[in-house]
């Protein structure tokens, strides 16, 4: 194994989820069908889909979306109606780098986060 090719996120309503990832997060849409939508996320394909089986009908793992300017991204997404759980905050400091995060809910109640690594000093 050498890289992640695709990450799946379950949806309850595919139209609502497609709109969220395309319009609010502004991820480029590859294509969609009646049950799924594929997005480009910097070389990793993001699959948003209705679960094929009950065993897949659960919340997704947290996806950490890297952004350059976390406060600016937080403000932009908040203005688009994205529901954040918390505000941007430092979660770790390693040497001269601070790791900042802000967690949010997607339209399907999955938790994801913005993350940014900031050089200080």
Model-based region annotation:
Residues 1-15, 45, 61-63, 116-121:
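N-terminal beta-strand motif that seeds the catalytic metal site of vicinal oxygen chelate
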